[in-house]
Amino acid sequence: GDTEMTPARRRLLLGGLALGGLTLSGVVAQRSGSLFNSCQALLPPTPAVDELIRWAWEGVDARRFLDCHVHLVGTGDSGSGIEVNPQMESLFHPLQYAQRLFYLNAGCVHDAPGRIDDSYVERMQNLVDGLRPGARLLLFAFDRFHDVEGRASRQRSSFYTPNAYAQAVAARNPQYFAWAASIHPYRDDCVEALAAAVAGGALAVKWLPPAMGIDPSSPRCDRFYAALAAAGLPLISHAGEEKAVHGGDQQAFGNPLLLRRALDHGVRVVVAHCASLGSAVDLDQGESAPQVACFD
C-alpha cells in the first residue's frame, strides 16, 4: 500500500533524519548532556515489566548467561588501536556522521578527549550491574575490510576494533566480559591469528560479511573453516540486509545460504539478526533465481 516502508523510502527517511540530526544534535547534547539516551542502568519500576523480567530469568543460572552480541567500539583515544572511518566524522557524509553520534549516545559516551574508549567500557559495566549477578557480555573485536587478495583497506572499513583490545578489556574485567575475535578469512595469517585468539581465551569469531568483504561461500575461506572447526569455536556471522555498518557495502554477502560452506566444514554457525530485513537470491533454485526474503 501507499504506507509500506520500502527500502527506498526507508533510505530517504534515514537520510532526512541524519540531516535533521546534524542540526539538532548540538542543541540536545548541550541541554541534556547526551542526544536521546537517559543512560539508566535499570528500567523504571513498573509492576508488569518487573514481572516479565522475573519470569524471563526464572530457571536461568546467570553464571552461565552470556549476551553474545555486543560490539566494542570507541575512537582509539585510549591507545586501544580502534580506528574509525573518517567519513563517520565528516559533515560531508551526513548519514554516517549521524550514525556515529547515535552510536556514541547509545553507549552513553560523551566527547571528552581521552575518555571515549574508557567511557564506553564503563557504560557496559554499568549495564551488567543491572543484570543478575554472574551475567556477562561477549565483546566483539571487528576486523577491517579486505579485498580478494587479502589486503586490508582502511578506506573501505567503517571501523576496526583489534583482537588485542577486546582481549585486554575482557582480561581486566572477567566478572563482566568475555570476548570474541574477528579474523578476516582472506588474510594470509588468518590461521595463525585464530591460534593466537584461542590461546588468548576467545570464545567465538565474529564476521560481518557485507561490511568486511567476506563471501562465506568462497573457497578462500576453507583453510580458516578447517582451523575454526578444529578449534571448536563458533562463528557468529551477520546475515540479511546490513544498514548499521557500511564498510564494503556488499549486500549479496549477507545471503544466509552462503554460510552452508562453513557448516559443511563442521563449523558451528550462529546467524545474527535472523529477524532482520533483506532479500537475497534463493541459491537452491540457481544463481539466476529471483530474490526472496532472507528470513521467513
Where are these regions (language model features)?
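N-terminal secretory signal peptides and thylakoid transit peptides that target proteins
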Residues: 4-20
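Catalytic pocket-lining loop regions of alpha/beta-barrel enzymes
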Residues: 203-204, 217-296
